[in-house]
Amino acid sequence: ERLDRLMGLPDQRAVECGGKRFLLCHGSPVDPDRYLYPDAEGKAFDFSGIDADYVLLGHTHYPMVRSAKRFCLVNPGSVGQAREQGGVADWCVINTENDVITMQKTPYDIAPVVRDCETYDPNIAYLQDVLRR
């Protein structure tokens, strides 16, 4: 039921908050399955036709902030499957009044999550490795 709800979500969503326009997408504004890594070349972030102040995305689980020609691209990382360090939830705060983006890391106990992985799918070794980094 929850998975069906997630699968039914749109690839993108435009929202306004604090007088700023946000485009929310998973992989990139042009492809929900595209990986945009922090070390990608500048042309990888050259999207035309974006009508937003901020583009928020995920997919890679790596935190990044990149200024593009007309917008700021932000990947806060991952709350549950951070790629840089296990046991840390990555997230950010965007201050729409002064356009300051503050990247955050919050440690959490991975033991209950690993136990759930082992209980519900003992073949999920990759996720357990990610969580234990």
Predicted regions and their residues:
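Conserved catalytic scaffold of divalent metal-dependent phosphoesterases
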Residues: 1-54
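Glycine-rich, charged/polar anion/phosphate-binding loops
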Residues: 9-11, 60, 78-80
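Short, acidic/polar N-cap/turn motifs at the starts of alpha helices
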Residues: 10-14, 62-63, 89-91
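Active-site neighborhood of phospho(di)ester-bond hydrolases with catalytic His/Asp-centered motifs
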Residues: 25, 54-59, 73-77
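Active-site environment of divalent metal-dependent phosphoester hydrolases
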Residues: 30-32, 56-67, 81-86
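Charged, low-complexity, helix/coiled-coil-prone segments
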Residues: 32-33, 37-40, 60-62, 123, ...
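Acidic, His/Gly-rich catalytic cores of divalent-metal-dependent hydrolytic chemistry
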Residues: 66-133
